[in-house]
Amino acid sequence: MGQELSQHERYVEQLKQALKTRGVKVKYADLLKFFDFVKDTCPWFPQEGTIDIKRWRRVGDCFQDYYNTFGPEKVPVTAFSYWNLIKELIDKKEVNPQVMAAVAQTEEILKTSSHTELTTKPSQNPDLDLISLDSDDEGAKGSSLKDKNLSCTKKPKRFPVLLTAQTSADPEDPNPSEVDWDGLEDEAAKYHNPDWPPFLTRPPPYNKATPSAPTVMAVVNPKEELKEKIAQLEEQIKLEELHQALISKLQKLKTGNETVTSPETAGGFSRTPHWPGQHIPKGKCCASREKEEQTPKDIFPVTETVDGQGQAWRHHNGFDFTVIKELKTAASQYGATAPYTLAIVESVADNWLTPTDWNTLVRAVLSGGDHLLWKSEFFENCRETAKRNQQAGNGWDFDMLTGSGNYSSTDAQMQYDPGLFAQIQAAATKAWRKLPVKGDPGASLTGVKQGPDEPFADFVHRLITTAGRIFGSAEAGVDYVKQLAYENANPACQAAIRPYRKKTDLTGYIRLCSDIGPSYQQGLAMAAAFSGQTVKDFLNNKNKEKGGCCFKCGRKGHFAKNCHEHIHNNSETKAPGLCPRCKRGKHWANECKSKTDSQGNPLPPHQGNRTEGPAPGPETSLWGGQLCSSQQKQPISKLTRATPGSAGLDLSSTSHTVLTPEMGPQALSTGIYGPLPPNTFGLILGRSSITIKGLQVYPGVIDNDYTGEIKIMAKAVNNIVTVPQGNRIAQLILLPLIETDNKVQQPYRGQGSFGSSDIYWVQPITCQKPSLTLWLDDKMFTGLIDTGADVTIIKLEDWPPNWPITDTLTNLRGIGQSNNPKQSSKYLTWRDKENNSGLIKPFVIPNLPVNLWGRDLLSQMKIMMCSPSDIVTAQMLAQGYSPGKGLGKNENGILHPIPNQGQFDKKGFGNF
């Protein structure tokens, strides 16, 4: 053993010197490890004693076979690198004398080492010879070495696994020199099956391309060797058959099906293909369906079974009805591109589906229009894939991908390669994701804007969904989506994102705007109203410095107490002129004590600071009242006209006011007091520009003898509206007053409260509750219609459990209060008995006694509630009115009588 290690070390040392002559430096220890690996994979190499390019390539083939069999983890990292270096040495040995000398010396070392190894023990078989052959490149046969002292108990290293120890010679053994080695190798190859699992210790790979006789080895009886190998193969076959039988029995126990066929008679064990790209040998097509012998894996169209001989059989089965039903339900309730629906599609697509299967599935699940859209997108994706396949040269064309032409039959499509099934799956699922969402136009990304009360996360989700339909995937346009997420957001979210716009991503945007909701929007509108700005201007200017102004000179940078430019004039006190208030005497207006002016009109009370006590502040109110009021009482004569041709006098609010749709009509102060000029009355009308901004001004009549403050009745129509101080919002039109001899109930109007206080709604109350039956998504619901609710509310007990609901950020107020109530996740289609329909998104609240139909639904139904008057109805009937028909000659006018009641405490134009 010591001699063998010494020779091995000398061989490695010579090789290191040869590599050094080529300019390659290697470590001695690494070369030792490399040749240890060579001895393990190529036991025949040290025994041959010759190094040439042909034998070294055989070593490379052994390396490659070992790598393919056991994987890269069993092969040293530097094995192939050192093999290439030594190959270059052998190729260049004729050119470099030093390398040639090193190779020759190494061959001598190998021959000596091989001879020493084979002669370590005395021989017990005098007829056994050792055959030593030179390289084929030298063209001469090696001399035979006969030594009667050699022992046959030492096994040769050509087939270390299959050979066993031999203790006695067989008298019938042929002469080793007469053995046909190539013929024996061909016969042994017939017993090899590539589908059998590898042995625990595989024999070293053998390269049949070398036709030469075996190299230096201890010759053994080839018949005994083949007998042992055949016995091992027969035992392997028996074990494999037993394994298949046990699998069949286990399958029978799991499924409880006693009719499962055995591996010898039918398909063997079945498997559902889940690995696209893994090539499996295919055999005949089994077109018949096993209707009563389906296992859980047989619910998918294409399956594959392998029999006991390793032959693969493909089967095609119909879709399981439960899969189609589940996918159809998800597409109908949530939409074809909803996350839940896409999850089911991807689960089905993980299996092998032919183009015909995809077409059948889509036609059964989607509507006719969506099916055509999917088919057009699928064909377009297949064209692109076919072009790439043509460039790659794999032969998978458009007909194969779409199942048309020569591949229109199911039998032809069943034989597709797994990689082709994967391409069909990718094209089909990509086309499914391109389907449009019903009710969402999705024309362009720029049209997706955040609503005033919409959560930012919902807005980003709509943006990403639209981008996915346009770009194919949201990741393709992520930068564009991020830009639009800021630009199309509402002002509140833009203000929150602006400082971190270039410092975070889209996820950071969502985190910054997570707390912005309806309550935040209302507070923001109030803050903007206090500052006298719009919401957008307030958000843009809230971080800017606000410099104070001098009250004396009006310049910034100092206060009035530090102003040096103000010069106090000590001129003599001037005598007062004609009093501008009463126009009766010469005195200061603040000292005027007259009650009426020179024309007899009553004068308003004094304004300004009072004689005693602090000056009262402006009356303020949170909603609809005066914010930052600067109210001053002015007579009608102080009003101005916009132009000489203006018909009315301009009216404006004396304060910044915030109006919301929930507040209804509100009275806005103008600071203008009556009375009107003699023989006139006033008519208040809103300006058209204010109506466009969402503020509705109600018409009103001002009596001639009204001495109170003139107010404007206004209402926010849809959104929160800010009424700035001093902006013209209405006009007062003065009209001539015609006096009549009608009876007068009160002699003087005076400062009576503005507006009418005696109008009320009259409705007969009965024991019957006015209810209405509607169908929401074809499910019947009954609810009240006179509740006064703004939104529709369904009690939780009537809500189907499979209908999705989500939490909301809004609070519902009324008789009680519900914080963060549940709401339907999607819009429901309502339908009445007359087949009128629309969309609503109701709230769901538990423990309600009855469902409530809100104004969001009743406004779509155009329901009108009225209080009929018996007197007026009788008058209309006497004049020829037909109930249920309209007024007028053609009976196409108003269908219901107009309730009316006299107001005897009123006087003036329009009252009777």
UniProtKB/Swiss-Prot annotation:
Q: Where is the active site?
A: 786
- Quick check: keyword DNA-binding in the entry? yes
Per UniProt, the ranges with Basic and acidic residues bias are 138-149
- Name assigned to this protein: Gag-Pro polyprotein
**Gene3D superfamilies attached to this UniProt entry:** 1.10.1200.30, 2.70.40.10, Acid Proteases (2.40.70.10), Human Immunodeficiency Virus Type 1 Capsid Protein (1.10.375.10), Retroviral GAG p10 protein (1.10.150.490), Zinc finger, CCHC-type (4.10.60.10)
Motif PTAP/PSAP motif in this chain: where? Answer: 211-214
What GO cellular component entries does it have?
viral nucleocapsid
Keyword annotations for this protein, in alphabetical order, are:
Aspartyl protease, Capsid protein, Coiled coil, DNA-binding, Hydrolase, Lipoprotein, Magnesium, Metal-binding, Myristate, Nucleotide metabolism, Protease, Repeat, Viral matrix protein, Viral nucleoprotein, Virion, Zinc, Zinc-finger
Family annotation (InterPro entries):
Aspartic_peptidase_AS, B_retro_matrix, B_retro_matrix_sf, dUTPase-like, dUTPase-like_sf, dUTPase_trimeric, G_patch_dom, Gag_p24_C
Residues annotated as coiled-coil are 217-258
Segments forming domain Peptidase A2? 781-857
Q: Which residues form the G-patch domain?
A: 868-912
- Compositionally biased region (Polar residues): 113-126
PROSITE patterns the record matches = ASP_PROT_RETROV, ASP_PROTEASE, G_PATCH, ZF_CCHC
Output the GO biological process annotations, alphabetical, semicolon-separated: nucleotide metabolic process; proteolysis; viral translational frameshifting
Annotated function: Nucleocapsid protein p14: Nucleocapsid protein.
Q: What is its EC number?
A: 3.6.1.23, 3.4.23.-
Quote the gene name from the UniProt entry: pro
Q: Which residues form the propeptide?
A: 101-162
Annotated region Disordered: the residues are: 113-149, 258-282, 593-626
Pfam families in UniProt: dUTPase, G-patch, Gag_p10, Gag_p24, Gag_p24_C, RVP, zf-CCHC_5
Taxonomic lineage per UniProt?
A: Viruses, Riboviria, Pararnavirae, Artverviricota, Revtraviricetes
Residue spans, zinc finger CCHC-type: 548-565
